[in-house]
Amino acid sequence: RLKDAGLQSVPGAGAEILTDSVKEIISPKKIDSDDWIRIMKESFELGLPASATMMYGHVETNNDIVEHYDKIAKLQKDLNGFMAFIPWSFEPNNTLMQKEGIVTVGAGGMQLLKMIAISRIIFDGLIDHIQSSWLTNGVGMAQLAIQYGSDDFGGTLIGEEVVSCTGSRSTELTDKRIIDSIKQIDYSAEERDNFYERVSMR
């Protein structure tokens, strides 16, 4: 019904880490891994593409990260519905997990760069676009992420209400700030639409 009403794609949020032992700790009220994958499959079969996300930097292990990558890769090989992959770090400030001492500090910039580089290698030939995650790591780290394998700076946001609650940084960027940040590292800025089709060179 939503597609008939004009829906053209779906978000890939809510994946967190696709390991249920982790999801039970960090997001017990959200759907489990199988349900997330089922929803993505049904969306792809209806012709609705999505992004795939991974939230790292909390209680996950390296094995959990590998399992997450593996599930995303297998689903993409089967149905080819993911337009982009977005790894982003958990920001613990003002969260219950921080108050309970489960997560005390964020993952940091080096971990972001590792995740970007690993994502580019794992999804080579599978998922074309890797997003820089400026929202959780800042503009400077997004510039580095582009040089480590990201090709999507990420968009301007209006009314973001999750990361902004952590008080870590501004959650809005103008298009000029994004363009300037890309040009500062000697890359060309290109505006795209939701489906990664070129709108204009900037």
Q: Whereabouts are the PLM-identified features?
A:
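Auxiliary Fe-S-binding modules of radical SAM enzymes
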Residues: D70, Q76-R202
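A generic short-segment signal for beta-strand/edge and adjacent turn/coil regions
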Residues: M54-G57, I122-D124
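Short hydrophobic alpha-helical runs that function as membrane-insertion/retention elements
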Residues: P11, S51-T53, D152-T156
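Conserved non-cysteine loop/helix-boundary elements of the Radical SAM core domain that shape
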Residues: R1-L48, M55-D78, M97-A107, S168-R169
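Structural detector of well-ordered beta-strand residues that form the stable sheet scaffold
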Residues: V10-P11, S51, I86, Q131
